[in-house]
Amino acid sequence: MAEARRVLITGASSGIGRHAARRMEQEGHRLTLICRNHQRAAETLDWIDPTTRVLEADLADLEQVDTLCATLLQEQEPIDALVLNAGLQYAGHRQPRWSRQGIELTLAVNHLAHQLMLMRLLPLLLQADEPRVVITASEVHNPTSGGGRVGSPAGLGDLAGLRSGAGSAMVDGKERFDADKAYKDSKLCNLLMGLELARNQPRLPVIAWSPGLVIPRSQDGFFRESRRANPLGQTLFGVVARDLLRLTESIENAGDLLTRLVLQLNAQPGFQYWSNSLTRPGQHRFEPTAPSAEACDPETATELWRLSDHLIATALADQC
């Protein structure tokens, strides 16, 4: 077996992340899994391995994320791979939800919590001999992709909502909340965050990836909030997309792809984006892909990072 790698994973309590974590644990790697509460931590340990290290932090609370990072920094254990996989969406809900710091929940969890972790834990990554960052994004960040064409397209505009601080429902500053677009925008933020990180740390491999459409049969995981808003519609959507049209990828295959990116891919310094694209019903091809034009804009990436950093700092200062 190859030398055990030290891997920190968010979003390992269900779905793709949980499957990948189990694979990596079975291969003898040293995992630290971030779970949002004690119940999720216990369930994750039961499914993966009772000896796996789990730390609790709710990504909807930047103060908890900051405390988590402080704990890891105090330990001074290098991180070989930082896997930013956690994500949520609540399409179907008409009103925005808010984090503890008053930030729209999709942005807070999918983007800001992960940028905070990147900023705080970067010293531990740079202590490792062969570090890498892996970010789970989505093809829906791209308005020309299959999923990106459904509903309002991703687009950050001039970042007016982010610029105005906590309390804005949409990153682009639009007053009307659109939960589906908020998710797409958060995935666009993930790619831009990775692009800016790679620019600032040119020797660090930064890999963003899209797993394809994954719709499990279970009632928990990624689509749980959307099922609560529209249980019948989401059930029918799953049956049609997964079972009839065969447009989806399985949790197992997607988890294996994530494991490959973390452990097996010969990652080169700089930013790269991989997509698990549907080629025909039941068939996917996993390969390097060009992100959307907006996801490649260096000026937007730099400004997004700056404004996100400012919002994080302001939110944490207000907790004091």
Protein language model regions, located:
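NAD(P)H-dependent oxidoreductase Rossmann-fold/reductase module
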Residues: 1-80, 87-89, 148, 171-320
